[in-house]
Each structure stands twice: as structure tokens, then as C-alpha cells.
A protein has these predicted regions:
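Hydrophobic stripe of amphipathic alpha-helices that form coiled-coil interfaces
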Residues: 49, 53, 82-85, 89, ...
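Membrane-embedded hairpin module used as a gating/binding unit in multi-pass transport
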Residues: 42-52, 64-89
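A transmembrane helix-and-boundary motif of multi-pass membrane transporters/channels
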Residues: 1-64
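Conserved catalytic-core motifs characterized by acidic clusters
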Residues: 16, 20-23, 52, 56-58, ...
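Oxyanion-binding "anion nests"
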Residues: 73-118
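Soluble C-terminal extramembrane regulatory/interaction domains of multi-pass membrane proteins
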Residues: 101-214
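A short glycine-/small-residue-rich loop at the edge of a beta-strand within enzyme catalytic domains
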Residues: 26, 30, 34, 59-69, ...
Length: 214
């Protein structure tokens, strides 16, 4: 009986290795990267809008930001398919830490999507080109570009860690710096600036937490 049990276990292992579908990690990785870069592009668009001295198409900006929700949903579906494919696959154990890390990244991207939607809505509803030269608005735009840079750098670093690439792409742009200090509220556009500051604060905090592996 012992021999029969061992033979049965060996057969089950072979069947598991041969018959069980492979781990579906490539679609999830591809969806995550596409979503991350789309989020980064959205922050770059906000930065460009804040620096514009011409009329800004706020409705288009907001529509593009809202479209990111579909990216997040597709990535969520791909991650669900990945996790489902690991349940019966013994070779998937090595991916557990990577999956947990990517779940954190997806949560970060979800927060960033919500924040860039908020910033885009603020621009659509309240932005006036006359404030493009305001120092605080300029800092918010700079920080939005830094967030975009940070998102791209984070997802590319993951690819390097996973062995999906051997080099880090050269990305132009500075990393996040210190939070923005406001000496005193703007006498006219304090609502606009306050809303932008809060969204960019939450975005940078979420990105910094993910970058630190929290």
C-alpha cells in the first residue's frame, strides 16, 4: 500500500506538471505596464495643462483621465486570471511574492487614477490660464511630472527585478522631492490650488509608499 501511495502521488505530480494550465503571468504583466504608462501620461497631461497660457480643453482632459478606470479594470481582470492559474500549479509558488508586489502596485495605480481624475476635474471646472505663472501652480505641475516619472521608473524597476529586462530605460525627469509648502493662500484661486495640492499630496504619498515596499 505504501508503494501504491507513492506511485499515486508521483502520478499526480506528473499530471499536475503536464496537464495543469501554465501560469498566466504575461497578460497580467503586460496589462500592468500599459496601465502604469497610461497613468503616467495622464499626469504629464495635467502638468502641461497647468503650464498653458492658452485655453485648456478641460473636458477632454477629464474624459481621458476617467478612461483610466477601464485600464484598471482590465488589469484587475488579468490579475484575477493570474491568481486563478496559480491555484493548482506547483510551479507558481515562486511567483507569490511577485504577485503580492503587483497587487500593491495595482492598488497604488488605482489611487493615482482617482487623484489624476480629481486634478483633471479641478482643471476642467476652475482652471484659469492667468494662474499658469503662479509659483504654487508651477510647483504642482512640476510635481505631476515627477509623479509620472516615478510611475514609469517603478514599473520598469519591477521588470528588471523579474528578469524581463536587463537594463533600466533612461527616463528623463527628476524624482519626487519635498512636499509643496504654501506660505499663504492665493487670494482668488485658493480653491483651485488647494484642490490640486491635496490630490498631488495623496498621489505622491501612495507612490512613495509603493516605492518603499510598504
Amino acid at each position: 500500500r505504501v508503494v501504491e501511495t507513492l506511485i499515486g502521488a508521483a502520478c499526480a505530480l506528473v499530471i499536475n506538471l503536464v496537464v495543469v494550465p501554465p501560469v498566466q503571468h504575461e497578460p497580467a504583466e503586460r496589462a500592468m505596464r500599459e496601465t502604469a504608462y497610461a497613468v503616467a501620461d495622464a499626469y504629464d497631461r495635467v502638468a502641461a495643462a497647468l503650464a498653458s497660457h492658452d485655453a485648456v480643453d478641460g473636458e477632454r482632459l477629464l474624459a481621458d483621465a476617467r478612461a483610466l478606470r477601464a485600464h484598471v479594470q482590465r488589469t484587475r481582470a488579468a490579475m484575477d486570471a493570474l491568481e486563478e492559474s496559480t491555484r493548482l500549479n506547483l510551479r507558481a509558488r515562486a511567483l507569490r511574492e511577485r504577485i503580492a508586489r503587483d497587487e500593491r502596485l495595482l492598488l497604488t495605480l488605482t489611487v493615482l487614477v482617482n487623484r489624476v481624475i480629481g486634478m483633471s476635474r479641478t482643471v476642467a471646472d476652475r482652471f484659469d490660464a492667468s494662474v499658469a505663472d503662479d509659483p504654487i501652480v508651477h510647483r504642482v505641475g512640476t510635481e505631476a511630472r515627477r509623479i509620472a516619472h516615478g510611475v514609469r521608473m517603478l514599473v520598469d524597476r519591477h521588470a528588471l527585478e523579474d528578469g524581463r529586462t536587463t537594463t533600466m530605460p533612461a527616463l528623463d525627469g527628476p524624482a519626487l522631492t519635498t512636499p509643496i509648502a504654501v506660505p499663504q493662500p492665493h487670494p482668488t484661486h485658493w480653491v483651485l490650488i488647494g484642490a490640486l495640492l491635496e490630490d498631488v499630496r495623496q498621489a505622491r504619498e501612495s507612490l512613495e509608499a509603493d516605492g518603499a515596499g510598504e
